[in-house]
Amino acid sequence: MAKGMMIVDGQRVNFDGEKNVLSVIRKAGIEMPTFCYYSDLSVYGACRMCVVEDEKTGKIDASCSMEPRDGMRISTNSARLLKHRRVILELLLASHNCNCTTCEKSGHCRLQELAQQFGVRKIRFPDTREHYEIDSSSPAVLRDPNKCILCGDCVRVCEEMQGMGILNFAYRGSNLQVMPAFDRKLAETKCVSCGQCAAVCTTGAITVKNQIGEAWRAIHDPSKRVVIQIAPAVRVAVGEAFGFPAGENVLDRLVTALKLMGVDEVYDTTFGADFTTIAESEEFLERLKNGGPFPMFTSCCPAWVKYLENENPKYLKNISTCKSPMEMVGAIFRDKYAAKDAADGRTTYHIAIMPCTAKKMEAARPEFIHDGRPDVDLVLTTREVIDMMQETGIQLGELELESPDLPFGLGSGAAVIYGTSGGVAEAVVRHCLPDKSKNALREISILGLRGDAPIKEASVTIGDTELKLAVVNGLANAKKLLKEIDGGKKFYHLIEVMTCQGGCVGGAGQPYGLKKSKEKRGDGLHLSDNAAMFKRAERNPVVVQMMAEYGEERCHELLHVSYTSK
């Protein structure tokens, strides 16, 4: 990596290892506009918004694709460059669906933001765009090609982070579009509904499917009893929209808000995560006893499960048969509320608040539909719940604290960290290790399972067996690891896979935020774990009692599922 000094707008700026001039400029405190630049993705250099002028040669080039050189002198805001950027914005707006007030991305749209920043009030160019059909076939996301500015962010995140390549460029010149191969609907592809394309989309071209209307109809229907479960990652992200720092746990305020909105009962998905930990640990120990099959994969991430079904079905025998915490809660609610519904003539309507768009797909899976109704009637993302609170005028910071309802509102610290990368694997290790001391907990926390590294490896000894563990962020990295396992280069007993970077805290349904926000959310979950009344799933008295009451056969019926090749 290069080291040196360059002049940026007359200011001396030292650089040491920055991969491009854009990074050096931002280091100098200048926020260069971009559409197509994400530091975690390859450099594309298509939008040309980040162009700079070399004061020595007069040459204009994209700073994202320029390597910094010692002695460079560049200008970022000359009259020539400002005119250049305004023209780009005008051209984009001329071929853009500008129904901004009704757009799902309004207020979070990069094109809208930069048009305001650069004072673009008039568009001098004619509207020559074609009108394309909106693709609403996916259970998780909606694709509107009429709002696409061809920045390529969705193409690269799908290929580089997830290794899926569902979206790509098609045609040439003025006919250029982003679409699935052969212009298929998303539902006709092998899309896993992770929603990361929507998370990086700079406009409203790809958005998470909005189901707020369905939620309000249920809440206002007197014949329905609306019960809600809240996932761990939601509590450390929802506050960001109301002035709380990323990572602050606002669960008790969110419970109050939901009750004010008309929800009857509010529970915590950590209750289901404790069920998952115990069931998955028992399954893992049984595999150790019987010699496999290994590796055993975690099954909490529905996008990961979908990927194996579509792309690597030979590994379906390796995936845990445990349902995700959301679906375990769904099955338990279906069982527990049946008699109550019959007695009072109401129908229990179950909503799950999740950080994840793939949960919308999971809730609609036939394995989780019984007697014509899904175990989870509706999945709302964190952003959808934020929108609902803002619609009602609720100010989260002004609310009193109210804990989730019992008995389904009690969860362990191990369950809370399900929301961050490595959390599921750590929860299983906590349960399986015979040593239950505080010192053992500290040792587990430094095994190497935590953090956002693409692939993390750790080992722990149980009895006479040294267990090999791995934690994977992103499907592209999972593919790499599977290839090494296939080739005999790697062996593991347990592998946790989360499709989203950083785990559920980085889910596509979370508030739009920087990478640092995701890291702080993960830190917030670990702080909540530290403060938890009990740290292990088997210490949850409600879960232990219910499992004893159900018995082994009924537990297996409610908590386990099998998957098949698609």
What are these regions (language model features)?
Residues M5, R12, D16-K83, K209-K566:
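Iron-sulfur-associated redox domains of electron-transfer enzymes in respiratory
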Residues M5-V8, N97, E130, P139-V141, ...:
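A short, structure-level motif marking secondary-structure boundaries and short turns
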Residues G10-R12, T101, I134, A187, ...:
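A generic secondary-structure micro-motif detector
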Residues R48-S193, A199, I206-D221, R225:
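Fe-S ferredoxin-like electron-transfer domains
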